[in-house]
Amino acid sequence: MSAINHLCLKLILASFAIINTITALTNDGTGHLEFLLQHEEEMYYATTLDIGTPSQSLTVLFDTGSADFWVMDSSNPFCLPNSNTSSYSNATYNGEEVKPSIDCRSMSTYNEHRSSTYQYLENGRFYITYADGTFADGSWGTETVSINGIDIPNIQFGVAKYATTPVSGVLGIGFPRRESVKGYEGAPNEYYPNFPQILKSEKIIDVVAYSLFLNSPDSGTGSIVFGAIDESKFSGDLFTFPMVNEYPTIVDAPATLAMTIQGLGAQNKSSCEHETFTTTKYPVLLDSGTSLLNAPKVIADKMASFVNASYSEEEGIYILDCPVSVGDVEYNFDFGDLQISVPLSSLILSPETEGSYCGFAVQPTNDSMVLGDVFLSSAYVVFDLDNYKISLAQANWNASEVSKKLVNIQTDGSISGAKIATAEPWSTNEPFTVTSDIYSSTGCKSRPFLQSSTASSLIAETNVQSRNCSTKMPGTRSTTVLSKPTQNSAMHQSTGAVTQTSNETKLELSSTMANSGSVSLPTSNSIDKEFEHSKSQTTSDPSVAEHSTFNQTFVHETKYRPTHKTVITETVTKYSTVLINVCKPTY
C-alpha cells in the first residue's frame, strides 16, 4: 500500500449534500422553506425526511445536480441480511442469482405496504444506472412527505426494489429535464413535477429558486432556503448572473446549473506572489453533490503547481508533502463582477496517519469544470430555475441564527439588493489563455503568464482520464454520478437520457419548456433532439473509450460538449456513493 493510501480515509465521496435537519416552514404564507444541512464526517451533507402514513424516517442524499427523488425498498435483495431489510434466499435479478453485497445496517429503507398514502404509478419502470456499474431499479409511485409537521402530498418518487447503490436514497432538486425517465426499457418517457416544482404548485414557495450556504468546512452545519435568501449568510455584494446553456445545439434552454467563469488564479497574500492561470471564459457547473473540484488538466496542473503538488498516476490524485503550511494562500475564482476566494485549507486532503502525503482536492478532467463543495463552502449561491439565473457572493462564515434575515425571491427572479452582473457570458469554447492579470490591482509581483494554447494542443493536454483517489473507481465523484453517487470529483453533468453503444451515442433531451399550471415543465409532446456521435469524433482517451461501450441510460452520467470541433465524451458518476480511498479535507 502506498503512502497516500495510509493517509487516506475510506469515505463516501458522494457529497450529495444531504439534508440532516429541517427547520420550521413559515406557516404564514411568506413563501419560503428552510432546511438545515448537517455536514457528516466532514465530507457530505445528509437529511432525514418523514415519508408515508404513518411516517417512515429515511435519510437521503440531497443533490442540486440531479432531479429525481428515490428511496431504497426494504426488500432489496442486494442488502446483506440485517434488521433494515427483508431476507431473501435464491433471489434473482435479470435471470441471475443475486449475491448480497451491500451493508445496509446504517441505511434506512422504505416499505410501501406500511403506508396508507402510497400510490403505485403504472407509468413505467424506474431505473438509474451509474458509471461505476451500480444501479437502482424499481417502480414509480407517489407519497406524502412530511416536513416539520407540514404534509406535502403527491410527491412522485422511485422505489428501488433492486439496488446496488450504497445509499438509502436521493433527493434531487435540479431541472426536471434531468430526470431519469428516458433511455431504458420500460421508461415512462415523460417528465414530471419534482420536489421543488411541487413546493411551488402547493404554494409553499412562489418561485422555483433556492439559496445554498454550506458554511465553513469545520462548522458542521449549513442551510438551504427554498424561495428566499438569507442576507446574513454572505458578505459584500450579491451579483446575479445568467445561467449558460452548455448544449445549445441540443436544447434551447439551460439544463444544468452552470454559469460563466471569467478567470482563475491563486495568490500568497503574505509574500505578495500570485499567478493568473486563465482569463478565458468557460462554463462551470456548481454542484453540491460534488465533493472536490474538477478542472481541465491544463488548469488543474497550474492550480496544483502553485503549491508544489504533483500528479500521482498510481493514486489518481495530486499529492504534496505533509504537513502543509496553508498560510495566506488562497485561490480566486473570477466571475467578472466579483471574485470568490477559497482558502488553501479547503483544498488540502489530510493523511490518516503521520508521515504520509497530503492530497490536493482538484481533479483533472477532459474538458469540464465542476465547482463542488470545496468551492461552494466559500460561496453563497442562489439558484433560480424558473428564470435561469445564478446569484453569487462571498460566504459569511461568521453568520449566526440571531442575525438571520430572510428575503423572498420575486417571481421574476429579482432579489432585493442584488446587482445585475455585467460580465459577458460564455458562448463557445476557446483555447485557454491569459490576456490579463486578475491581480493587477494588488501591485504584487506575478508569476509568468500561462502561454496561449492552440486548439489542438489544448485538446491533447486536456484529454486525460478523470480519476478518484482510487484508480480502480470508474466513476468520478466529485460528481456523484452514482458515484455521487458518482460523486467523487466528478462532473455530474447531464442533459438528458443517454444510451450509448460502441458505434453510436444518442442523447435525448427536451428542447422546450412549457408551463403546466404553476409548475414549469417540458411538454409531454415536446420534440427531443438527437445528437449523433460517430467514432471519428470521439476522443482517444482510453477511459472514455471504455465507457463508450458501456450501456448508460441515465442522463447524469455522460456529458457532451463540442470542444474545438471535437466532441469529448466524459463519463460522470452521479449518485453512486462509493467507498474509496480518498483523503479527508484538512481545515
UniProtKB/Swiss-Prot annotation:
Pfam family membership, one: Asp
Sequence segments annotated as region (Disordered): 466-505
All copies of the Peptidase A1 domain together span 45-393
- Give the Enzyme Commission number: 3.4.23.35
Which biological processes are named by the entry's GO terms? cellular response to pheromone; conjugation with cellular fusion; fungal-type cell wall organization; peptide catabolic process; proteolysis
Q: What induces it?
A: By alpha factor.
The protein's annotated catalytic reaction(s) are: Selective cleavage of 6-Leu-|-Lys-7 bond in the pheromone alpha-mating factor
Query: Which of this chain's residues carry glycans?
Result: 84, 90, 268, 308, 366, 398, 468, 503, 551
From the record, give the cysteines joined by S-S bonds.
322-358
Xref: SUPFAM superfamilies: Acid proteases (SSF50630)
Q: What is its main location?
A: secreted
- Annotated Gene Ontology cellular component terms: cell periphery; extracellular region; fungal-type cell wall
Cellular localization per UniProt: Secreted
Tell me the active site: 63, 287
State the UniProt keywords alphabetically: Aspartyl protease, Disulfide bond, Glycoprotein, Hydrolase, Pheromone response, Protease, Secreted, Signal
Q: Which InterPro entries match?
A: Aspartic_peptidase_A1, Aspartic_peptidase_AS, PEPTIDASE_A1, Peptidase_aspartic_dom_sf, SAP-like
GO terms (molecular function) for this protein are:
aspartic-type endopeptidase activity
Position of the signal peptide = 1-24
User: What superkingdom does the record give?
Assistant: Eukaryota
Q: Which PANTHER family match?
A: ASPARTIC-TYPE ENDOPEPTIDASE, BETA-SITE APP-CLEAVING ENZYME, ISOFORM A-RELATED
- Identify its protein family: Belongs to the peptidase A1 family.
Additional observations: It is found only in a mating type cells.
**What does this protein's UniProt record list under function?**
This protein called 'barrier activity' is excreted by yeast cells mating type a. It is probably a protease that cleaves alpha-factor and thus acts as an antagonist of this mating pheromone and establishes optimal pheromone concentration for conjugation.
- Name the record gives this protein: Barrierpepsin
In which organism is this protein found? Saccharomyces cerevisiae (strain ATCC 204508 / S288c) (Baker's yeast)
The gene name reads BAR1
